[in-house]
Amino acid sequence: MQQRRPVRRALLSVSDKAGIIEFAQALSARGVELLSTGGTARLLAEKGLPVTEVSDYTGFPEMMDGRVKTLHPKVHGGILGRRGQDDAIMEQHHIAPIDMVVVNLYLFAETVAREGCSLEDAVENIDIGGPTMVRSAAKNHKDVAIVVKSSDYDAIIKEMDANEGSLTLDTRFDLAIKAFEHTAAYDSMIANYFGSMVPAYHGESKEAAGRFPRTLNLNFIKKQDMRYGENSHQQAAFYIEENVKEASVATAQQVQGKALSYNNIADTDAALECVKAFNEPACVIVKHANPCGVAVSTSILDAYDRAYKTDPTSAFGGIIAFNRELDAETAQAIISRQFVEVIIAPSATEEALKITAAKQNVRVLTCGQWAQRVPGLDFKRVNGGLLVQDRDLGMVSEAELRVVSKRQPTEQELRDALFCWKVAKFVKSNAIVYAKENMTIGIGAGQMSRVYSAKIAGIKAADEGLEVKGSAMASDAFFPFRDGIDAAAAVGVSCVIQPGGSIRDEEVIAAADEHGIAMIFTDMRHFRH
């Protein structure tokens, strides 16, 4: 549908001033009359633009410290008036039609994110007039264009130039959708904030405030449609959070390869989150959301080589993540050695991309460097509900470890224990990881009994000819029986790191002492389901 409406009068009132001067100049140059409020009006006037204050247009001043500015029939009548149907009543009450509304809302999210923000601060940053104008204009999109995103400014001017100062109904409808999405997200933020403040408001523990609101409203933006979901009979799409700053698969830029699949995204997320746990140059190879090889070294090339050797069979068709820039030498090693679905790194050199480009099916993502892990919430959908928890960012330092065995670990055993403890956190429970000299040598994932995960890790190491004797073993949760320790001892493990906390801890510790194994408790569990 191409029904056009000329833009002759626009009302501009924005909190985010990015691009507004240039947009207003472009509108004015095309003969559009400008109405504006408060700070936006002052800014436009300072730039020499002919602008009419809304208070002058309505004959009613701003009042109550700016709480009442645009809530007036001459404003909303001009926006909501149906062209060709309400013309007589508009003329009778001297209401001029407003053809475009340019509004973005008070920065509520930024306000409540500031340290020390009080409930009163939050309340004063709840926009009333803005959402009202946005909804009015979106409702009357057949006649009015509503603009809530500065990223649309250029396209709007281009379309006006192509249509003699008019916008099509298709464009106005699309802008209306964005407007309703904008106000829905805004109201959700406010509802989430107020819901999370209920305990503090009633004088209860402040620790409960700001965490889990009474009603949870989530807003995600569709990034891409997919050919199918986890399986070919399932339809799927990928949605992302708006304004995410953390390096992630959601914010990563795809610089090469065909479109990411549902499973690509899930596995890439698992690989990237694991590699973020390491400060040294690291490589993580993931298959079906589980690490199948992890290593740290002095270079990502050596880290990749060592991670690959853990389980070359599983690495085929896997996802590879690095915490350093992908260089040409490493790219060549990967391409010449294995089939890979996705490579993700903070960045990639031009030479590396030329090499990976030779394999058109290889997807390469760059996500930018990260400073530290960002706290947030994890969600798990269950039928009829949603489980919500803090992200598992828990880590233990060497100083927090407790040696509970008779034998103390050697320095190398301690380093290996801390390394495989980091890896175990990202392996599906029940998780067992064997490691030696900063590389995994066997990973047992997702078994219903812990002892079988331990046995599988040993089998994996033996299959690849990796020496288990003198290695460390990490378990994501406590050992309910001594059998896991016996299985580890049988293949030569010399140090075990685990949370502890079983009613049979003494039995398990006794097994370690019997085998001469050093045992470390972390007092922190890392289930992953």
UniProtKB/Swiss-Prot annotation:
EC numbers, comma separated: 2.1.2.3, 3.5.4.10
Ranges for domain MGS-like: 1-148
BP GO terms, sorted: 'de novo' IMP biosynthetic process
GO cellular component assignments: cytosol
Pathway connected to this protein: Purine metabolism; IMP biosynthesis via de novo pathway; 5-formamido-1-(5-phospho-D-ribosyl)imidazole-4-carboxamide from 5-amino-1-(5-phospho-D-ribosyl)imidazole-4-carboxamide (10-formyl THF route): step 1/1; Purine metabolism; IMP biosynthesis via de novo pathway; IMP from 5-formamido-1-(5-phospho-D-ribosyl)imidazole-4-carboxamide: step 1/1
Domain notes: The IMP cyclohydrolase activity resides in the N-terminal region.
Protein's recorded name: Bifunctional purine biosynthesis protein PurH
Gene for this chain: purH
